[in-house]
Amino acid sequence: MSEKIQVLGSRKGLTPALQHYSVVNVADNSGGKEAMIIGVYGYRGVLRRVPFANIADMVMVSIKKGTPEVRKQKFRAVIVRQRMPYRRPDGTWISFEDNAVVIINPDGTPKGTEVRGPIAREAAERWPKIASLATLVV
């Protein structure tokens, strides 16, 4: 039996940034280039409401573009960048140039060996194994 990944943090007061069927970039070297969000782990919403996800949330993605070995497969991923501005507790507003995810294994370790581009500090605090591969934490 596989261990359950503990998802930490509160979702209260978050802006709906990425939802079902959002197309995102893959920010690691696992073989995928573009992915589509098809599920949000830990989302407890209202019937028929479209689930949404934000920075540092774990989502289920389907790889749409990439190497033939990973295309048309489903993976778990963590959102590390989002275009929609969000507010930090100190009052600053942060937004990135693109929406990006890092593909992870079922045990929570990154599938790739490097992360391209910056990642958000919220994702680095919640997922330290991803932060160890990142070149820049904003």
Curated annotation (Swiss-Prot):
Keyword Ribosomal protein: yes
Keyword Ribonucleoprotein: yes
GO molecular function, one term: structural constituent of ribosome
Matching Pfam families: Ribosomal_L14
Alphabetized UniProt keyword annotations: Cytoplasm, Ribonucleoprotein, Ribosomal protein, RNA-binding, rRNA-binding
Locations listed in the record: Cytoplasm
Similarity-based family: Belongs to the universal ribosomal protein uL14 family.
UniProt protein name: Large ribosomal subunit protein uL14
Recorded name of the encoding gene: rpl14
